[in-house]
Amino acid sequence: MSPKDVVALYYDAWISKRGDMSAVPLAPDFKFRGPVANFDDAESYRAMAREAGAMVTSFTVRQQFTDGNRVCSIIDWEMALPVAPMTSAEILEVENGQITRGELIYDAQELRAAMAAGR
């Protein structure tokens, strides 16, 4: 599987499986960095994805670029929270058929405020 094929499984989990990452090949020590949360292992990330995935109402990969084992995706997504649609960039690194690292980049100010207000 190419890095892009592995990453396609990851995005399919967001698009059609409500964040269920059980079939996604995340390395056990998968590292994720984002504006709202950071994770240092696959199981913690999977738990967050299941919770967040239940609130995602729209998720579209607008564009993807590959550079060796890195896949950069531009994503448009919406959540069942009182926030505007969001656009983000995500960089995923793949080694030996597993996603080892992810970095999500977007302006999370509105999302953090909605989460803090308990909406």
Please tell me what each predicted stretch does.
Residues 1-119:
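C-terminal and inter-domain tail/linker signature
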